[in-house]
Amino acid sequence: MEQSQSQRQAWPSSSAGGGKAQDSGVLTREDFDGGPVSIDEVDTGLFLGNLTAATHMETLRSFKITHILTLDSVPLPQHILEASFLTTKYIQIADMPREDILQHLEGCVDFISSALAQQGNVLVHCYFGVSRSSSTVIAYMMKRHNLDFLPAYELVKAKRRFVQPNAGFVSQLKLFRRMGCKIDPNCQRYKIHRLRLAGEQMRKAKILPQSFHSVVRPDPDITRENPEPIVFRCRRCRRVLASKSHVLEHKPRDRPPQEVVPKEKEEVAAAKLPAQSHDQAENHHGARMLEQLSERIRQSSLGSPGHESTPNYCRSILFVEPIAWMHRIMLNTQGRLYCPKCEQKLGNFSWINACKCPCGETMTPAFYLIPSKVELSKAVQNVQTTV
């Protein structure tokens, strides 16, 4: 039996969770009340059903089931797992909107595709066959028939009328489709999805679990393999802080996108502005300069097919991914960001609270750099030149 990457914990035999502890110390599903057998053929050889169907040997033989994909809190009973005519795969997941079903979809779709390619019959099930299992079947239908979420959902619902993925799973299915029915680590929405999951863990544990350490990107000042050509540096000491791919772009919300203002018009506009404090003027100038520089290098720096670029994106605040040089971000829920070289304050971070940009957009979790504290540079053949 194939297992998900998450580890299952041993439960005592007296647990009320509907499972029975085996000698191996692994909880399996033995006692349950999932109602009568419920199973429907959604596509040729692909069946969607409930736990009762997956544990009823006569049903499995009647529908000539050869493969079972289980999405539940515990695995199937041992006598099903040991059946010689069955190949099984188990994903440990609860039916909750904040559960990360997205990380499993690609593997589940591959399992279904492989089984059908062998002329087998696949049963995908959870407890009632309503949310977790239907989400997986919808993901398969999206990829198999090149469908967006809604047509795939309606196709499955036409075969099994009471399917209903929870709201969190629906959002993740739409993201799965946006990424081409695969995990694209360069997709900005996927990055934000992973950050939000990590933020939930930080809220509970006050420390970043090892399973989420990958959301913290390597330090670009140390990385020497395939360095990115566009970087952000500390304005004071010119230490590399972030690469262009680390930036989480956003559109202005409360004001319309502004075009880059030509220098001569900029000077006239500046003459009409009321007097500002030094910090206000510095921040305004820094954000404006970043907008101009980003516009000039946009085509050369956004060449990655997985990068989602939005025209006229805001630079009032520079939201970035968490990066390894950010001191103690794995051990604190929020704090300030300082340059690791000159110790100048560069911005702030929070895993648990939203940060609102002056444009009106919010980001949660938020790791941001103050535009006036950094500068955009372009590297040419390992020689850094300020644009």
Curated annotation (Swiss-Prot):
Residues 1-15 have a biased composition (Polar residues). It is found in: Nucleus; Cytoplasm. GO terms for molecular function: phosphatase activity; protein serine/threonine phosphatase activity; protein tyrosine phosphatase activity; protein tyrosine/serine/threonine phosphatase activity. It catalyses: O-phospho-L-tyrosyl-[protein] + H2O = L-tyrosyl-[protein] + phosphate; O-phospho-L-seryl-[protein] + H2O = L-seryl-[protein] + phosphate; O-phospho-L-threonyl-[protein] + H2O = L-threonyl-[protein] + phosphate. The active site is at residue 126. Pfam families: DSPc. One of its GO terms (cellular component) is nucleus. The keyword Cell cycle does not apply. Keywords: Cytoplasm, Hydrolase, Nucleus, Protein phosphatase. Inhibited by the tyrosine phosphatase inhibitor sodium vanadate. PROSITE patterns: TYR_PHOSPHATASE_1, TYR_PHOSPHATASE_2, TYR_PHOSPHATASE_DUAL. It is an enzyme of class 3 (hydrolase). Residues 1-27, 248-267 are annotated as: Disordered. Its main location: nucleus. Residues 35-182 form the Tyrosine-protein phosphatase domain. Its EC number is 3.1.3.16, 3.1.3.48. One of its GO terms (biological process) is negative regulation of MAPK cascade. Belongs to the protein-tyrosine phosphatase family. Non-receptor class dual specificity subfamily. Dual specificity phosphatase; can dephosphorylate both phosphotyrosine and phosphoserine or phosphothreonine residues. May suppress bsk/JNK activation during the immune response. Interacts (via tyrosine-protein phosphatase domain) with bsk/JNK; the interaction dephosphorylates bsk. PANTHER family: DUAL SPECIFICITY PROTEIN PHOSPHATASE 12 (PTHR45848:SF4), DUAL SPECIFICITY PROTEIN PHOSPHATASE 12 FAMILY MEMBER (PTHR45848). This is Dual specificity protein phosphatase MPK-4. It comes from Drosophila melanogaster (Fruit fly). The gene is MKP-4.
